[in-house]
């Protein structure tokens, strides 16, 4: 007896210890599942956002809700059971027997839907489920574009931070050189102080780039639904597109005068929001047919057993509402108006798609030419000019103003080039999203 009590106590202690351990480890497990990797590629960022972003979670829940509506719409009405007792003289002094002194009825009734109501109702719900699924795909398309834009914004801020830091380090090297030249009497103290004052502008560039980088990372982490928005994050991808992204066809199409009709036709066939609008048209048309079917009333068939004061019998009945006053005119009018509204929304969506594709094509074409022009005309020349002026300044041939102008010009050229690369790549992703290209990899 004592042994069994002791074993029972040990068992409950183990259960309690396991429960406490699970409660302590659960927050860590949840945090581990929602954590974002320290090193993140663009492909990983898009995958994490599609999985964890609250908007995507809500869209998937909407699909589940639409599936529930479909299941409910496909079900038949439940039968009804009625038990009636009538006529028993409960308040008389000489009461007869209970079973033979009343009218007792047990009856089953089943409502029969007419005019194909259940089929039409199920078709409406199936269209709603398809619209919810396509809506989730469209939400994934938009979130994917937002993540790509936020990721590249952080990469741009990171590149600008590198340019600002490099320029500051170059200024510091020149200041160190001028201190040595001042000690040797080659320059005046005013020139050194002028350079030290000018250094503040480059320091301000570094601080501004730091802030832009932190804000860009926080924006990206928010899209990834990270538990904290100040997490350290190393971005692996750069500003230039890689061949694995599948953007070459879009780049060629943006440069081809005949590429716009092909991309527009693809967008009108593949974009989820266009497909949603078309599915809503089908749903509205089916809903109109359903409302017209509701003009025909349902029939309820009933039958059962009746004991009428000791006599057994069978009861049978048919119930049908008489549509004298209400023939569902309001429901039909509303459904017809919603059908016209669905047609108008489909036309509006197609117009938006045409505008999105054309604007994305314009941006991709302009940004491609912009990058090529900067690479051909300015990038190499700005670096060579800066190097020549820097060497001339070190030799005492060029003055301080020439050096500062060349340094600023090189810094501005680098930042302009980084911005052009950013705009080009983002415009290609915008074109892919406008066309509805699911095969384009991040």
Where are the regions that the model predicts?
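Transmembrane beta-strands of outer-membrane beta-barrel pores
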Residues: 85-91, 112, 305-309, 322-324, ...
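Bacterial Sec-pathway N-terminal export signals of envelope proteins
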Residues: 31-88, 102, 107-112, 120, ...
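Acidic, low-complexity, intrinsically disordered peripheral segments
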Residues: 1-10, 32-34, 416-442
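Residues that define the transmembrane beta-barrel architecture of outer-membrane proteins
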Residues: 100-104, 310-314
